[in-house]
From Swiss-Prot:
Name used for this protein in its record: Large ribosomal subunit protein uL6
Source organism, top-level taxon: Bacteria
Record keywords, A-Z: Ribonucleoprotein, Ribosomal protein, RNA-binding, rRNA-binding
GO CC annotations on file: cytosolic large ribosomal subunit
HAMAP family, alphabetized: Ribosomal_uL6_B (MF_01365_B)
Similarity comment: Belongs to the universal ribosomal protein uL6 family.
Function: This protein binds to the 23S rRNA, and is important in its secondary structure. It is located near the subunit interface in the base of the L7/L12 stalk, and near the tRNA binding site of the peptidyltransferase center.
Matches recorded under InterPro entries: Ribosomal_uL6-like (IPR000702), Ribosomal_uL6-like_a/b-dom_sf (IPR036789), Ribosomal_uL6_a/b-dom (IPR020040), Ribosomal_uL6_bac-type (IPR019906)
Pfam entry (one): Ribosomal_L6
Protein's GO biological process: cytoplasmic translation
Residues spanning the membrane: none
Quaternary structure note: Part of the 50S ribosomal subunit.
Protein's organism: Acidobacterium capsulatum (strain ATCC 51196 / DSM 11244 / BCRC 80197 / JCM 7670 / NBRC 15755 / NCIMB 13165 / 161)
Amino acid sequence: MSRIGNKPIPLPAGVKYTHAGGKVVVEGPKGKIEQVIPEGIKLETKDGHIHAIRETEKHAAVHGLTRALVFNAVEGVTKGWSKDLDIVGIGYRAELKGKDMVVFTLGYSHPIEFPLPTGITAVIDPKQTRVTVSGIDRQKVGQVAADMRSLRKPDPYKNKGVRYVGEKLKKKAGKAGSK
């Protein structure tokens, strides 16, 4: 039994929603998202809410997934999604080059140029140590943030590197010296 799948999705004013042939198109003030829906799930609109209804018990596994995908699309076109990254380390920083390129200086012998995909924007604070990745597609925002983090993952000994804001890191003890 899917509890998430049974929750109705509120459809805010100004959001257009169409469902045809296994695809859902959600259009709102921030843009337009097309989302592929798994087979066996019907979407119905009642009283300003979208309901995900499974046709048989075999489709219980994708019931909650379908509801979450549609909810993420509706939230994306109304509020948008964002992920914050902290850059920790002496000399580590990021800067914007044009509108679609972030250049990272992360202690390597060369700066790393990171191209931003379409639909994704990055904002860098004045100290150049915090990057905010935002867009309307939740999956794409999370993937870009994960790719940026993988350029220099946090070091377990000094905790230097690129990390998510609020990420808890375990610091390892160094090797015990001889006494």
